[in-house]
UniProtKB/Swiss-Prot annotation:
PANTHER family: IGLON FAMILY OF IMMUNOGLOBULIN SUPERFAMILY-RELATED, OPIOID-BINDING PROTEIN_CELL ADHESION MOLECULE. The keyword Glycoprotein applies. It comes from the Eukaryota. Residues 39-126, 136-219, 223-310 form the Ig-like C2-type domain. This is Opioid-binding protein/cell adhesion molecule. Keywords: Cell adhesion, Cell membrane, Disulfide bond, Glycoprotein, GPI-anchor, Immunoglobulin domain, Lipoprotein, Membrane, Repeat, Signal. One of its GO terms (biological process) is positive regulation of cell size. It comes from Rattus norvegicus. Belongs to the immunoglobulin superfamily. IgLON family. A lipid is attached at N322 (GPI-anchor amidated asparagine). It holds the Pfam family Ig_3. Glycans are attached at N44, N70, N140, N285, N293, N306. It is a lipid-anchor; GPI-anchor.
Length: 345
């Protein structure tokens, strides 16, 4: 919009036109001077969004009239303010310097500014370009997500800023130097594995201010895997405990069987306790009939697995006494009936 669009009085428009004619500065066409040292405006001015920008113009006693323009709009002519923007103020108007300030600078203030002077002989101009920098800001980022193992995952992180920020993704839930880094708005993970679960950090950086950082959590579901199951030896009349530990997401539910019979707390003097990843089967007073093989079954919505654990008495010879046999199994669970096929290893 031209300057007359901002003014309410026709005579002011006439004065502006007169100023342009007086300075011989047609709209949008600054006059060039052969004297490169006069007037002398600053080099390009770079400020951050929200700061104040000072535009200085060096002049001398040959100057009879002086003005600051933004493109074709006069901001100040001498001490007279023509801009209706309250953020624009005059700082210095002396025989050697003519300076204005733009407060609380925003991106729309960026562009060319012209110092125009009139001497006894010729009109002269000098131009400065205002550059507005904007700190990085993440505007849109993916929400926390839960997926099944072997799925594909795409995370999005959109950021703005001036200069345009660099967006980097980093996996936080691994040791330093072991996680992968992606310099892109999109992070794509194909056939995601359980060890790729955890927090992912998006960082937007453009060196204007501290990076903007946000995090996304990926939860990877996977079927149970029995990581620890140990055979136990105990004498008749003593307390015996069989323990079974399973890793799974969601957390596994446990069941205990002896042959085809499902065990329950309070039956035959046993107690079953499930705490997190560990399930224990406790015998408070072991008898001869308690000796034998027990099966721990761990189940979640993605599948199940089991391990065979032996409770044995003194002098018994057990293969692999330090670890129970594990098995991949096909299971049918219905009431107390338990059928299975083992592939032992």
């Amino acid at each position: 919009m031209g300057v007359c669009g901002y003014l309410f009085l026709p005579w002011k428009c006439l004065v502006v036109v007169s100023l342009r004619l007086l300075f011989l500065v047609p709209t949008g066409v600054p006059v060039r001077s052969g004297d490169a040292t006069f007037p002398k405006a600053m080099d390009n001015v770079t400020v951050r969004q929200g700061e104040s920008a000072t535009l200085r113009c060096t002049i001398d006693d040959r100057v009879t009239r002086v003005a600051w323009l933004n493109r074709s709009t006069i901001l100040y002519a001498g001490n007279d303010k023509w801009s209706i923007d309250p953020r624009v103020i005059i700082l210095v108007n002396t025989p050697t310097q003519y300076s204005i300030m733009i407060q609380n600078v925003d991106v729309y203030d960026e562009g060319p500014y012209t110092c125009s002077v009139q001497t006894d002989n010729h009109p002269k101009t000098s131009r400065v370009h205002l550059i507005v920098q904007v700190p990085p800001q993440i505007m849109n980022i993916s929400s926390d997500i839960t997926v099944n193992e072997i799925s594909s995952v795409t995370l999005l992180c959109l950021a703005i800023g001036r200069p345009e920020p660099t967006v980097t993704w980093r996996h936080l839930s691994v040791k330093e130097g072991q996680g992968f880094v992606s310099e892109d708005e999109y992070l794509e993970i194909s056939d995601i594995k359980r060890d790729q679960s955890g927090e992912y950090e998006c960082s937007a950086l453009n060196d204007v201010a501290a990076p903007d950082v946000r995090k996304v959590k990926i939860t990877v579901n996977y079927p149970p895997y029995i990581s620890k199951a140990k055979n136990t030896g105990v004498s008749v009349g003593q307390k015996g405990i069989l323990s079974c530990e399973a890793s799974a997401v969601p957390m596994a539910e446990f069941q205990w069987f002896k042959e085809d019979t499902r065990l329950a707390t309070g039956l035959d003097g046993v107690r079953i306790e499930n705490k997190g990843r560990i399930s224990t089967l406790t015998f408070f007073n072991v008898s001869e009939k308690d000796y034998g093989n027990y099966t721990c079954v761990a189940t979640n919505k993605l599948g199940n697995t089991n391990a065979s654990i032996t409770l044995y008495g003194p002098g018994a010879v057990i293969d692999g006494v330090n670890s129970a046999s594990r098995a991949l199994a096909c299971l049918w669970l219905s009431g107390t009936f338990f059928a299975h096929f083992f592939i032992k290893f």
